[in-house]
């Protein structure tokens, strides 16, 4: 059953409404126009769409001192395919990820925070496919 009602004249066809992770098989055929259109033998191909859309950046990132550690908190993202969060400590122009796997909770305690005058943090969201969001706004904490 053809996806397009009439032959197309370009070498591009967009099939919309597909499900990520499901494999689709296509049979592309050349059609010679005429009173009785002739179809050539088809070329088969498969495609499996993937989610490449990252979640939104986390909002409301805050940091506060808790003794020698720094607590970083943020608001939960609402995406249905959210996999977790990454927390980064920013020192100079270098951002270092502090967690090895995405965090499920919306809080992180940086127990190894260096004793600097200023430290900044940002948080990213990661979806189930591993797409990572843009960084949140930085939260900067100043040593008292």
Model-derived segments and spans:
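Short beta-strand segments within Ig-like beta-sandwich modules, predominantly Fibronectin type-III
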Residues: 3-9, 98-104
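Hydrophobic beta-strand residues of extracellular immunoglobulin-like
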Residues: 13, 61, 72-73, 108
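Beta-strand-rich modules
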Residues: 13-37, 110-132
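Short coil/turn motif common to extracellular beta-sandwich-like domains
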Residues: 20, 65-71, 118
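Extracellular fibronectin type III
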Residues: 31-55, 127-144
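Short beta-strand segments of immunoglobulin-like
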Residues: 59-65
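Conserved aromatic anchor
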Residues: 68-82
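Short beta-strand elements bearing conserved aromatic residues within extracellular beta-rich modules
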Residues: 85-87
